[in-house]
Amino acid sequence: MLDSKLLRTELDETAAKLARRGFKLDVETIGKLEEQRKSIQVEVENLQSTRNSISKQIGQLMSAGDKEGAEKIKQQIGSLGSDLDAKKIELDAVMAQLDDIILSVPNIPADEVPNGKDENDNLEISRWGEPKSYDFELKDHVDLGEMGDGLDFASAVKITGARFIVMKGQFARLHRAIAQFMLDLHTEEHGYTEMYVPYLVNADSLFGTGQLPKFGKDLFHTEPLTEKASDEEPRKLSLIPTAEVPVTNLVRDTISDEADLPLKMTAHTPCFRSEAGSYGRDTRGLIRMHQFDKVELVQITKPEDSMNALEELTGHAEKVLQLLELPYRKVLLCTGDMGFGSHKTYDLEVWVPAQNTYREISSCSNMWDFQARRMQARFRRKGEKKPELVHTLNGSGLAVGRTMVAILENNQEADGRIAIPTVLQKYMGGATHIG
């Protein structure tokens, strides 16, 4: 969430920055609430000061042996206490309204993020690789998978429902190989520590990374979600929409040493999304699923290092595509297409031949201090007493299912076989083709 001080001292400037991403900050309501807060705060402080002064008088009278005088003044203390409690309740109510507003406010975009309404206004930064030309009729990954009896959508529908998949044989092995390759690359060459994390998380974790309270409908919950998780209600949990949630929350309520930063973590997990609002989109194939695997990259950095870290993290995701020899493009998301908590985001879009277009396969974001403030994730500089908020970054490195789509379609051959990328062959028992 944003620093509440921005709504107190830079309200108009903050509203103008948020307007770039199409968000209208209710300046009038915030201004009125802030005036109420200041007024009530002054009353609370005056009542506290008066009570302290009277308490001091009582102590002096008691020391002087004037018990009768002390008792008379004590009656005033009782009345002041009631008034003070009432004002504190008023103050809490106003603060709660301000907190509700702050929690609904997205992150401020970086200055270099282009203005825009939607994905059509994103800025292409670069391209890598050239889409192949084929002298035969292309098949999409669904047809290729069904030809090889490796992608079984019908069984998944029977077992669970739409937007799920059963993989078999070499297709299942390819799916596993892709994830293993990504983890090995990121841990052995890019310096990430592999993490195994829970696939179920509590409400505090989802609040920390920004999914709650705004995006609860996009999640799968084991039971109706409570605002606060507790040991007495351990089953009121949610399936993770991304490993970003459990991995980033590892630093919640912690103070790291400056020397330990940056923290670089990676995890391979299934991800679960209800895809609310996407009815009718990408209904065929593996592009948009309720359950899909992803290798996530997370970095925790000092504030001054986070922008360089975003370039590095994005480069790590790009390296996966380059080693797999998959054509892709890198785009800088415009203000209208950014995620709720993002300060700056790059998308990597891989070439999907059957659709004759580029499709998102990775989203890499600098969340600035937006998540850290929610999580109270901090660090302490050497020689300093006061801790500071860290910056958090995350990105897909990559989405496994969409990577598989790209491999199947880009590497198909005229006889229906699929060429296995060289870097994956050792994970496939030395096989060079599927089919």
UniProtKB/Swiss-Prot annotation:
User: Is Nucleotide-binding set as a keyword in this record?
Assistant: yes
E.C. designation(s): 6.1.1.11
Spell out the Gene3D superfamilies in the cross-references: Bira Bifunctional Protein, Domain 2, Serine-tRNA synthetase, tRNA binding domain
- Report TM segments: none
Q: Which UniProt keywords apply?
A: Aminoacyl-tRNA synthetase, ATP-binding, Cytoplasm, Ligase, Nucleotide-binding, Protein biosynthesis
Keyword Nucleotide-binding listed? The answer is: yes
**CDD domains the UniProt entry points to:** SerRS_core
Q: In which pathway does it act?
A: Aminoacyl-tRNA biosynthesis; selenocysteinyl-tRNA(Sec) biosynthesis; L-seryl-tRNA(Sec) from L-serine and tRNA(Sec): step 1/1
- GO MF, one annotated term: ATP binding
Broadest EC class assigned to this enzyme: ligase
Record family assignment: Belongs to the class-II aminoacyl-tRNA synthetase family. Type-1 seryl-tRNA synthetase subfamily.
Q: How does it assemble?
A: Homodimer. The tRNA molecule binds across the dimer.
Name the UniProt record assigns to this protein: Serine--tRNA ligase
Species lineage: Bacteria, Pseudomonadati, Pseudomonadota, Gammaproteobacteria, Vibrionales
